A protein has these predicted regions:
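Extracellular/lumenal glycan-associated context and N-glycosylation machinery
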Residues: 1-58
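Exposed, interaction-prone extracellular/peripheral surfaces
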Residues: 3, 109, 198-382
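Short acidic, flexible loop segments centered on an aromatic residue
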Residues: 50, 60, 83-99, 209
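Membrane-cytosol interface motif
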Residues: 59-77
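Hydrophobic beta-strand positions in extracellular immunoglobulin-like domains
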Residues: 61, 77-78, 119, 134
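Short, acidic/polar linear motifs in exposed loop/turn regions
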Residues: 80-84, 123
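Short proline/glycine- and polar residue-rich coil/turn motifs
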Residues: 105-113
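Cytoplasm-facing regions of membrane-associated proteins and arrestin-like adaptors
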Residues: 113-230
């Protein structure tokens, strides 16, 4: 990178030019000499940034995924890849919205310097660490040259989770589960026998009954449906009284989602402008780390419509929001969920007492802490 002047350097350059020009114009030799001296200092500052160091830089995080509050540390290793001794330099390490300035001492050829650093994890977030940059400049801060040595690395600070073993809110069990009243000729829940009709799959002929009655008889089944759980989170800031409600809501979505994936059920998670990744629990939690509210985000009033549009086959729908929407708002949102879908609306209000109200296929629950979630779900399925 080409050396450049800092804001102080540009000010010094302006002062040097003005001093020389005014000194010569007014015949003020002292002012002209001061301007010339300042110009010499600027030239020397630029010369101190000339030359390219050869570094091998390794930015390593002990773990790319941590839970809120867990310790996250990284190691920065800088090796002098040249044969000659390097000059002292300054290393800039951006960490999220902040960063650190590390002093790099003079290194002999092939020598290494290590720095350990800690990353704050008090809040759910995706923390971007890096890129690592070396900075060479003069002691007065007039000029500097910055070189980039690494790509940025993401640290995912996952939301808190609570175990939901035994508390799944599903209504239709996956494959081996609850049968419907729809009849099928090729499913897993046996219903009855009927006369063979041309075109029936001969694999389902019941030969013992056929031999006894003298006519072909085939098996008929009850249709079983594959459970799909749809989770939808409000991202409208007007639905949340404070940040704690949002964090509780995200942790609720994450806990239910992880449990659903562990049970190998189909899952759709709607939060923000798109769907969250649900191929594995870690990927789901990675996306949960980045969830935020934004002006124009989908509020609880639009969650039911969004499920109907993006997950119409869902057998279970869970809508999660803050404490601001009224019970009437929650019921209105649930009315847009496809008919026949078991619907649960959860209101997150830190400090509130748990409550569950069920009417038909709709349940509305309130939880005050994440530890309340298993009890709320048990009341719903009970």
């Amino acid at each position: 990178m080409v050396p450049r002047l800092s804001p102080i350097g540009w000010g010094a350059l302006a002062a040097a030019v003005a001093g020389v020009a005014l000194g010569r114009g007014l015949g003020w030799l002292e002012l002209a000499a001061a301007g010339a001296a300042l110009a010499v200092v600027l030239v020397l500052a630029l010369l101190m940034t000339v030359g390219r160091e050869r570094y091998e830089v390794d930015l390593d995080l002990a773990d790319r995924r941590v839970r809120v509050g867990e310790r996250a540390v990284g190691r920065l290793t800088v090796r002098n890849a040249s044969r000659r001794r390097s000059l002292p330099a300054r290393i800039e390490l951006p960490v999220g919205a902040g960063g650190a300035d590390l002093a790099l001492p003079s290194l002999a050829g092939g020598a290494e310097h290590d720095d350990l650093f800690a990353i704050p994890t008090s809040h759910r977030a995706v923390v971007v660490v890096g890129p690592v940059r070396s900075v060479r400049g003069d002691p007065l801060g007039l000029a500097r040259r910055t070189l980039r040595w690494t790509e940025p690395v993401e640290l995912f600070v996952h939301p808190e989770l609570v175990s939901l073993t035994g508390s799944s809110a599903g209504v239709l069990r996956d494959l081996e589960g609850q049968a419907t009243r729809d009849l099928s000729d090729s499913d897993l829940s046996f219903h009855a026998l009927r006369d063979y009709v041309a075109g029936d799959d001969r694999r389902y002929i019941h030969w013992r009954t056929t031999a006894r009655q003298g006519v072909l008889m085939v098996k008929q089944f009850e249709d079983t449906r594959r459970t799909q759980t749809a989770l939808a989170l409000s991202t409208d800031p007007r639905d949340f009284d404070d940040d704690d409600e949002l964090e509780l809501a995200v942790s609720t979505i994450a806990s239910i989602g992880v449990q659903t994936l562990r049970e190998q059920r189909d899952l759709v998670v709607l939060a923000g402008p798109g769907r969250l990744r649900v191929s594995t629990p870690p990927l789901l939690l990675d996306d949960c780390s980045a969830v935020s509210v934004e002006i124009g985000g989908t509020g609880v009033s639009g969650l039911g419509r969004r499920i109907a549009r993006e997950a119409p086959a869902a057998s279970v729908a869970v809508l999660v929001t803050g404490s601001v929407p009224t019970p009437a708002d929650l019921r209105a949102a649930a009315r847009h969920v496809p008919v026949g879908t078991r619907t649960l609306v959860l209101t997150c209000s830190p400090g509130a007492e748990i409550s569950v109200r069920t009417q038909g296929s709709l349940s509305i629950g309130t939880l005050g802490t994440l530890d309340d979630l298993p009890r709320v779900l048990r009341r719903v399925v009970g």
